[in-house]
Amino acid sequence: METLSQRLNVCQDKILEHYENDSKRLCDHIDYWKHIRLECVLMYKAREMGIHSINHQVVPALSVSKAKALQAIELQMMLETLNNTEYKNEDWTMQQTSLELYLTAPTGCLKKHGYTVEVQFDGDVHNTMHYTNWKFIYLCIDGQCTVVEGQVNCKGIYYVHEGHITYFVNFTEEAKKYGTGKKWEVHAGGQVIVFPESVFSSDEISFAGIVTKLPTANNTTTSNSKTCALGTSEGVRRATTSTKRPRTEPEHRNTHHPNKLLRGDSVDSVNCGVISAAACTNQTRAVSCPATTPIIHLKGDANILKCLRYRLSKYKQLYEQVSSTWHWTCTDGKHKNAIVTLTYISTSQRDDFLNTVKIPNTVSVSTGYMTI
């Protein structure tokens, strides 16, 4: 009994030293788990001898000591395997080598640099759950260690190892648990992923797909430096005249997307009269520029815009129409931002929209007028 008590004192003193030192060396953490294992063995032996209290500590049941010892052995072996690789030179804290983190999804491996992934179920901002993804996941299999990165998609959080995808968080199961299981939004790293994506149009359409034909203005009006024309208010348009290009083939349209051309026919060039901004005020729009409509172009990542467009359904009274996600076809592929266009009955309605709807910082807003 006395020998067992002395051994337990020495073992626990060593464990306390590791807590106080808070080392970042992997070899020190291996030694820590060796002593945790030894402590469990001593407790197991004490209970086996019929001892229920030692050094004023309650001796746990045999099954408890055995389970803790097995966990300590597993972690010790994991760290020893890692210690035989180049990763032993990295900084390792006690938290990063703790049992709690080891058992956190993905279980049975070490991980570093976690960040939060927020999932919103059923479009309810009050029905959200937070999950953890990891920048570095250390997989030790058959004595070999590999580092992979945790990734996120609409199905869940996963990593890829040797071509095999392993999901350690399944959003489908989580959605059934916390919602109807039909739809959810994933917010991670400044990106927004919406599921199911089928509720949105994923077609990439050109600007001609939105405005297929513009009315011809008979008279061209000169303007000041600020003008009101097709597109956004970025830049200044000059009064121009052009001739109508003859059409060689009839224009065919997609019955599912009436505004989208099926064949690569060009859109008619028209005499688009440029009207001064002063003449395009809301009060005089119906008289001086009856063919123009206030618009907003929202530019940014396609997934973020799809999510934003879905949320705009809550503010239908603040706009007239909203387009599907589209792109300019003549831009450099490296900077191919997606665009969503909204139209308004009046500029005051557009102002109310901008004052009410929260636009993400990653989405740029351009205002202007469109001839419809």
From Swiss-Prot:
Domain of life: Viruses
Chain spans, region DNA-binding domain: 292-372
Region (Transactivation domain): 1-200
InterPro entries, A to Z: E2/EBNA1_C_sf, Nucleotide-bd_a/b_plait_sf, Papillomavirus_E2_C, PPV_E2_N, Reg_prot_E2, Regulatory_protein_E2_N, Regulatory_protein_E2_N_1, Regulatory_protein_E2_N_2
Primary location: host cell
Cell compartments where the protein resides: Host nucleus
Post-translational modification note: Phosphorylated. Sumoylation plays a regulatory role in E2 transcriptional activity.
Gene Ontology terms for molecular function: DNA binding; DNA-binding transcription factor activity; nucleotide binding
Keyword Transcription regulation found: yes
Glycyl lysine isopeptide (Lys-Gly) (interchain with G-Cter in SUMO) crosslink, residue number(s): 299
Protein keywords: Activator, DNA replication, DNA-binding, Early protein, Host nucleus, Isopeptide bond, Phosphoprotein, Repressor, Transcription, Transcription regulation, Ubl conjugation
Coiled coil start-end: none
Gene Ontology process terms (BP): DNA replication; DNA-templated transcription; regulation of DNA replication; viral DNA genome replication
GO cellular component: host cell nucleus
Region (Disordered): 235-262
Membership in a protein family: Belongs to the papillomaviridae E2 protein family.
Subunit relationships: Binds DNA as homodimer. Interacts with protein E1; this interaction greatly increases E1 DNA-binding activity. Interacts with protein L1; this interaction enhances E2-dependent replication and transcription activation. Interacts with protein L2; this interaction inhibits E2 transcriptional activity but not DNA replication function E2. Interacts with protein E7; this interaction inhibits E7 oncogenic activity. Interacts with host TAF1; this interaction modulates E2-dependent transcriptional regulation. Interacts with host BRD4; this interaction mediates E2 transcriptional activation function.
HAMAP family cross-referenced by the UniProt entry: PPV_E2
Chain's role: Plays a role in the initiation of viral DNA replication. A dimer of E2 interacts with a dimer of E1 in order to improve specificity of E1 DNA binding activity. Once the complex recognizes and binds DNA at specific sites, the E2 dimer is removed from DNA. E2 also regulates viral transcription through binding to the E2RE response element (5'-ACCNNNNNNGGT-3') present in multiple copies in the regulatory regions of the viral genome. Activates or represses transcription depending on E2RE's position with regards to proximal promoter elements including the TATA-box.
Protein name in the entry: Regulatory protein E2
Species the sequence originates in: Human papillomavirus 31
Gene coding for it: E2
